[in-house]
Design a protein with these regions (language model features):
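Surface-exposed loop/turn positions
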Residues: 113, 175-177, 210
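A short SAM/SAH-binding and catalytic strip from SAM-dependent methyltransferases
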Residues: 180-193
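A short acidic, Gly/Pro-enriched loop at the edge of an enzyme's catalytic core
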Residues: 169-181
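Conserved alpha-helix/loop element of class I SAM-dependent methyltransferases that forms part
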Residues: 77, 88-111
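Class I SAM-dependent methyltransferase SAM/SAH-binding core
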Residues: 116, 122-170
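N-terminal auxiliary segments of SAM/dcSAM-dependent transferases
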Residues: 1-68
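A short glycine-rich, Lys/Arg-flanked "PGG" loop and its adjoining helix->strand segment in the class I
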Residues: 196-208
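C-terminal alpha-helical "lid/dimerization" subdomain adjacent to the S-adenosyl-L-methionine
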Residues: 196, 211-247
Protein backbone atom coordinates (compact mmCIF):
# COMPACT_ATOMS: atom_id res chain seq x y z
CA UNK A 1 0.00 0.00 0.00
CA UNK A 2 1.44 3.39 -1.01
CA UNK A 3 1.59 5.89 1.85
CA UNK A 4 2.71 9.56 1.94
CA UNK A 5 5.36 8.78 4.56
CA UNK A 6 7.31 7.05 1.81
CA UNK A 7 8.10 10.57 0.59
CA UNK A 8 8.99 13.24 3.17
CA UNK A 9 8.33 15.88 0.51
CA UNK A 10 4.62 15.07 0.68
CA UNK A 11 4.30 16.12 4.32
CA UNK A 12 3.75 19.75 3.32
CA UNK A 13 -0.01 20.28 2.97
CA UNK A 14 0.36 22.75 0.11
CA UNK A 15 2.79 20.56 -1.80
CA UNK A 16 0.63 17.52 -1.11
CA UNK A 17 -2.33 19.26 -2.75
CA UNK A 18 -0.26 20.12 -5.81
CA UNK A 19 0.96 16.55 -6.08
CA UNK A 20 -2.55 15.18 -5.60
CA UNK A 21 -3.78 17.33 -8.47
CA UNK A 22 -0.85 16.33 -10.66
CA UNK A 23 -1.25 12.62 -9.95
CA UNK A 24 -4.99 12.91 -10.55
CA UNK A 25 -4.24 14.29 -14.01
CA UNK A 26 -1.87 11.38 -14.63
CA UNK A 27 -4.47 8.86 -13.58
CA UNK A 28 -7.06 10.36 -15.90
CA UNK A 29 -4.68 9.93 -18.82
CA UNK A 30 -3.27 6.57 -17.75
CA UNK A 31 -5.07 4.45 -20.36
CA UNK A 32 -3.86 6.70 -23.19
CA UNK A 33 -0.33 6.68 -21.80
CA UNK A 34 -0.36 2.89 -21.61
CA UNK A 35 -1.60 2.56 -25.20
CA UNK A 36 1.07 5.01 -26.33
CA UNK A 37 3.74 2.92 -24.67
CA UNK A 38 2.46 -0.42 -26.00
CA UNK A 39 2.27 0.89 -29.55
CA UNK A 40 5.61 2.71 -29.26
CA UNK A 41 3.90 5.97 -30.22
CA UNK A 42 6.27 8.80 -29.39
CA UNK A 43 5.65 11.53 -31.95
CA UNK A 44 2.07 12.65 -31.38
CA UNK A 45 3.29 16.22 -31.04
CA UNK A 46 4.81 16.13 -34.53
CA UNK A 47 2.90 18.28 -37.01
CA UNK A 48 3.58 20.60 -39.91
CA UNK A 49 3.30 23.58 -37.58
CA UNK A 50 5.62 22.22 -34.88
CA UNK A 51 8.12 20.89 -37.43
CA UNK A 52 8.65 24.43 -38.66
CA UNK A 53 9.42 25.67 -35.14
CA UNK A 54 11.49 22.91 -33.55
CA UNK A 55 14.16 20.32 -34.37
CA UNK A 56 12.89 16.79 -34.94
CA UNK A 57 14.42 15.38 -31.75
CA UNK A 58 12.22 17.67 -29.66
CA UNK A 59 8.99 16.70 -31.40
CA UNK A 60 8.14 13.63 -29.36
CA UNK A 61 6.31 12.56 -26.23
CA UNK A 62 9.36 12.46 -23.95
CA UNK A 63 9.08 9.36 -21.73
CA UNK A 64 5.67 8.96 -23.39
CA UNK A 65 4.53 12.07 -21.54
CA UNK A 66 1.43 13.69 -22.97
CA UNK A 67 2.31 16.77 -25.00
CA UNK A 68 6.07 16.35 -24.72
CA UNK A 69 7.62 19.56 -23.39
CA UNK A 70 5.31 21.76 -25.43
CA UNK A 71 2.10 22.33 -23.47
CA UNK A 72 0.99 24.42 -20.51
CA UNK A 73 -0.30 21.24 -18.89
CA UNK A 74 3.13 19.62 -19.12
CA UNK A 75 4.82 22.71 -17.68
CA UNK A 76 2.29 22.89 -14.85
CA UNK A 77 2.97 19.30 -13.80
CA UNK A 78 6.72 19.18 -14.41
CA UNK A 79 8.09 20.31 -11.03
CA UNK A 80 5.72 18.07 -9.10
CA UNK A 81 6.60 15.03 -11.20
CA UNK A 82 10.33 15.51 -10.79
CA UNK A 83 10.05 16.10 -7.04
CA UNK A 84 8.00 12.93 -6.60
CA UNK A 85 10.41 10.83 -8.64
CA UNK A 86 13.45 12.18 -6.80
CA UNK A 87 11.89 11.90 -3.35
CA UNK A 88 11.81 15.65 -2.86
CA UNK A 89 15.49 16.04 -3.82
CA UNK A 90 15.12 17.84 -7.16
CA UNK A 91 15.80 21.27 -5.70
CA UNK A 92 18.78 19.93 -3.76
CA UNK A 93 20.18 18.59 -7.02
CA UNK A 94 19.66 21.96 -8.67
CA UNK A 95 21.51 23.70 -5.84
CA UNK A 96 24.60 21.53 -6.41
CA UNK A 97 25.84 24.11 -8.90
CA UNK A 98 25.70 27.01 -6.41
CA UNK A 99 29.01 26.26 -4.58
CA UNK A 100 30.84 26.16 -7.91
CA UNK A 101 29.31 29.48 -8.87
CA UNK A 102 30.13 30.95 -5.46
CA UNK A 103 33.78 30.04 -5.97
CA UNK A 104 33.79 31.55 -9.46
CA UNK A 105 32.04 34.76 -8.36
CA UNK A 106 33.98 35.29 -5.12
CA UNK A 107 35.37 38.82 -4.81
CA UNK A 108 33.65 40.01 -7.98
CA UNK A 109 30.89 42.57 -8.43
CA UNK A 110 27.79 40.51 -9.24
CA UNK A 111 26.25 43.48 -11.05
CA UNK A 112 28.91 43.09 -13.73
CA UNK A 113 28.48 39.33 -14.17
CA UNK A 114 26.24 37.40 -16.54
CA UNK A 115 24.87 33.86 -16.21
CA UNK A 116 23.08 31.80 -18.86
CA UNK A 117 20.92 28.80 -17.93
CA UNK A 118 20.22 26.58 -20.94
CA UNK A 119 17.12 24.42 -20.89
CA UNK A 120 15.85 26.59 -18.04
CA UNK A 121 12.44 24.88 -17.97
CA UNK A 122 10.18 26.35 -15.31
CA UNK A 123 12.92 28.58 -13.91
CA UNK A 124 13.48 26.81 -10.60
CA UNK A 125 17.27 26.87 -10.80
CA UNK A 126 17.37 30.51 -11.87
CA UNK A 127 15.24 31.36 -8.86
CA UNK A 128 17.88 29.79 -6.58
CA UNK A 129 20.57 31.75 -8.40
CA UNK A 130 18.71 35.03 -7.93
CA UNK A 131 18.10 34.29 -4.25
CA UNK A 132 21.87 33.98 -3.85
CA UNK A 133 22.95 36.78 -6.22
CA UNK A 134 19.93 39.09 -6.65
CA UNK A 135 21.84 41.67 -8.71
CA UNK A 136 23.34 39.14 -11.11
CA UNK A 137 22.27 39.46 -14.75
CA UNK A 138 20.71 36.13 -15.78
CA UNK A 139 19.24 34.72 -18.97
CA UNK A 140 17.12 31.58 -19.26
CA UNK A 141 17.07 29.78 -22.61
CA UNK A 142 14.49 27.14 -23.55
CA UNK A 143 12.72 25.95 -26.69
CA UNK A 144 9.35 25.60 -24.99
CA UNK A 145 7.20 28.71 -24.94
CA UNK A 146 4.94 27.02 -22.38
CA UNK A 147 7.83 26.40 -20.00
CA UNK A 148 9.19 29.90 -20.51
CA UNK A 149 5.80 31.26 -19.52
CA UNK A 150 6.05 29.36 -16.25
CA UNK A 151 9.62 30.60 -15.79
CA UNK A 152 8.37 34.15 -16.13
CA UNK A 153 5.83 33.51 -13.41
CA UNK A 154 8.39 31.99 -11.05
CA UNK A 155 10.92 34.77 -11.65
CA UNK A 156 8.61 37.79 -11.72
CA UNK A 157 9.86 39.12 -8.37
CA UNK A 158 13.41 39.53 -9.74
CA UNK A 159 14.99 42.21 -11.90
CA UNK A 160 17.89 41.78 -14.35
CA UNK A 161 16.48 38.46 -15.55
CA UNK A 162 15.68 37.69 -19.18
CA UNK A 163 14.09 34.71 -20.92
CA UNK A 164 14.81 33.71 -24.51
CA UNK A 165 13.17 31.10 -26.73
CA UNK A 166 15.87 29.19 -28.56
CA UNK A 167 17.95 26.05 -28.97
CA UNK A 168 20.89 25.15 -26.75
CA UNK A 169 22.82 24.03 -29.83
CA UNK A 170 22.42 27.50 -31.37
CA UNK A 171 22.68 29.93 -28.46
CA UNK A 172 21.67 33.42 -29.66
CA UNK A 173 24.38 35.22 -27.69
CA UNK A 174 27.81 36.64 -28.62
CA UNK A 175 31.12 34.87 -28.10
CA UNK A 176 32.78 35.26 -24.68
CA UNK A 177 29.74 37.04 -23.26
CA UNK A 178 28.86 34.90 -20.21
CA UNK A 179 30.58 34.51 -16.85
CA UNK A 180 28.83 31.19 -16.22
CA UNK A 181 26.65 28.73 -18.14
CA UNK A 182 24.47 26.21 -16.34
CA UNK A 183 21.92 23.52 -17.08
CA UNK A 184 19.91 21.01 -15.07
CA UNK A 185 18.37 17.77 -16.38
CA UNK A 186 18.96 18.76 -20.01
CA UNK A 187 21.72 16.68 -21.57
CA UNK A 188 20.09 13.26 -21.17
CA UNK A 189 17.23 14.52 -23.36
CA UNK A 190 19.55 15.44 -26.25
CA UNK A 191 20.85 13.11 -28.97
CA UNK A 192 24.64 12.52 -28.73
CA UNK A 193 25.41 14.70 -31.75
CA UNK A 194 23.34 17.59 -30.36
CA UNK A 195 25.06 17.23 -26.96
CA UNK A 196 28.45 17.75 -28.56
CA UNK A 197 27.24 20.78 -30.49
CA UNK A 198 25.65 22.20 -27.33
CA UNK A 199 28.86 21.82 -25.35
CA UNK A 200 30.75 23.65 -28.09
CA UNK A 201 28.14 26.42 -28.00
CA UNK A 202 28.49 26.74 -24.23
CA UNK A 203 32.26 27.01 -24.62
CA UNK A 204 31.78 29.65 -27.31
CA UNK A 205 29.64 31.99 -25.20
CA UNK A 206 31.65 31.48 -22.00
CA UNK A 207 34.46 33.83 -21.14
CA UNK A 208 37.81 31.99 -20.87
CA UNK A 209 38.18 30.10 -17.60
CA UNK A 210 34.57 30.59 -16.52
CA UNK A 211 32.48 27.69 -15.11
CA UNK A 212 29.98 25.38 -16.78
CA UNK A 213 27.58 23.97 -14.16
CA UNK A 214 25.89 20.64 -14.87
CA UNK A 215 24.22 19.19 -11.72
CA UNK A 216 23.32 15.52 -12.10
CA UNK A 217 21.36 12.93 -10.21
CA UNK A 218 21.72 9.19 -9.71
CA UNK A 219 18.95 6.76 -8.75
CA UNK A 220 18.63 6.20 -5.01
CA UNK A 221 17.18 3.47 -2.85
CA UNK A 222 14.37 5.86 -1.94
CA UNK A 223 13.41 6.48 -5.56
CA UNK A 224 13.39 2.70 -6.06
CA UNK A 225 11.08 2.42 -3.07
CA UNK A 226 8.72 4.92 -4.69
CA UNK A 227 8.65 2.80 -7.82
CA UNK A 228 7.83 -0.30 -5.77
CA UNK A 229 5.04 1.59 -4.03
CA UNK A 230 3.53 2.71 -7.32
CA UNK A 231 3.59 -0.87 -8.55
CA UNK A 232 1.02 -1.65 -5.87
CA UNK A 233 -1.42 0.03 -8.25
CA UNK A 234 -3.04 -2.06 -11.00
CA UNK A 235 -0.40 -3.10 -13.53
CA UNK A 236 -1.45 -0.95 -16.48
CA UNK A 237 -2.04 2.07 -14.28
CA UNK A 238 1.30 1.83 -12.48
CA UNK A 239 3.20 1.50 -15.75
CA UNK A 240 1.45 4.56 -17.13
CA UNK A 241 2.19 6.65 -14.04
CA UNK A 242 5.84 5.57 -13.96
CA UNK A 243 6.27 6.46 -17.60
CA UNK A 244 5.04 9.98 -17.02
CA UNK A 245 7.06 10.36 -13.82
CA UNK A 246 10.24 8.93 -15.32
CA UNK A 247 12.98 11.45 -15.92
Amino acid sequence: MWRPEFIPFLRSRRISLNIDLSLAALLRRSSNIHRRRERRVYNEVLSTETRAKRPSYDLQNFHFQSGGWMTDDSAERYDTQVEVLLNGAANAIRRQALPQLHEAFAGRDQRKLRLLDIGCGTGRFLDFVKQTWPRLQTIGLDMSEAYLKHSQRHLKRWTRTGLVAGKAEAIPLPDNSQDAVTNTFLFHELPPKVRRITIRECARVLKPGRPFGNPRFTPTRRSSRLRRALRALPAELSRAVLLELHY
